[in-house]
Amino acid sequence: MALALVLNSGSSSIKFQLVNPENSAIDEPYVSGLVEQIGEPNGRIVLKVEGEKYTLETPIADHSEGLNLAFDLMDQHNCGPSQLEITAVGHRVVHGGILFSAPELITDEIVEMIRDLIPLAPLHNPANVDGIDVARKILPDVPHVAVFDTGFFHSLPPAAALYAINKDVAAEHGIRRYGFHGTSHEFVSKRVVEILEKPTEEINTITFHLGNGASMAAVQGGRAVDTSMGMTPLAGLVMGTRSGDIDPGIVFHLSRTAGMSIDEIDNLLNKKSGVKGLSGVNDFRELREMIDNNDQDAWSAYNIYIHQLRRYLGSYMVALGRVDTIVFTAGVGENAQFVREDALAGLEMYGIEIDPERNALPNDGPRLISTDASQVKVFVIPTNEELAIARYAVKFA
């Protein structure tokens, strides 16, 4: 069985999957796992093989040791690189800047180009590079492929991609809208076309990727024409811990009146804002319980969250001119029926009508949740970024 190894390297963790690229979107990966608490004494590796779960607790010094230990654990359970045919390795890379519009076969030169983009993604790209370096040493004889979160949004028209600031400053410092979650938005927008069995160029779609991080995209005939995240993943929708769109003047105000440093404001907006900053929680199951108990902070957080979804929805309906499908995906988008219902409430005049019974069904693969009379077909489609990355990677094998 030919498999692709998919790696998602974070600052203190590595998520990995062994994926059969021929799988359907809802098939479980053959192997999945997580290396966590890298650099800490309480490191842990969790491995899941065809439904069975195995755990190794040990200090993990760095990404190299973490990935080697993960492979050793896989070998112990007959699913490691020495027993299986790994044909390619796909690496999720958060930021490709303006340099990368499509997946790239990784070479030393490509690694240096990704490293040069670290100023655009200082929280993500360094860890992505670490994962690439380690994996190339451990598996030197298979192609390694970088798949960029930003790649899908290279098609944005200038009016959507550029900010109204001094053009020379913007050009010098790479300031523009890049967009993120691109692999997910592309995956579900392609999937809905397959479900409808229509030519890609005939379908206009609005995609909601709603997880702890959240973004939306307007996709016209298979090409992204707008998206809610910007130069960084901080922009756009209200998220679990991120503020989303705010008046930029707030940054100056906090600096001048509260004496906060840039790093403190960065931490506030990225980690202490959003739904959690407003309500104290960022898990929508907890938020729903609080709302049911009439917690006013939870109500306020939820209303602000929904308001921002609807603002972007209206904007993208205008940008597309004609909307054929709407797709919800990711943790909240796939599982929180009340979010879907409230995001699309009262839009029957625009041809959008949710079927309450369909919307209430459990998350079990792609499904239609709009009424038969709805002009706009609304779907819940589970995203599978790892499968998408695996399929890209094996093309280079």
UniProtKB/Swiss-Prot annotation:
Its EC number is 2.7.2.1. Its cofactor is Mg(2+); Mn(2+). Mg(2+). Can also accept Mn(2+). Transmembrane segments: none annotated. Catalyzes the formation of acetyl phosphate from acetate and ATP. Can also catalyze the reverse reaction. Belongs to the acetokinase family. This is Acetate kinase.
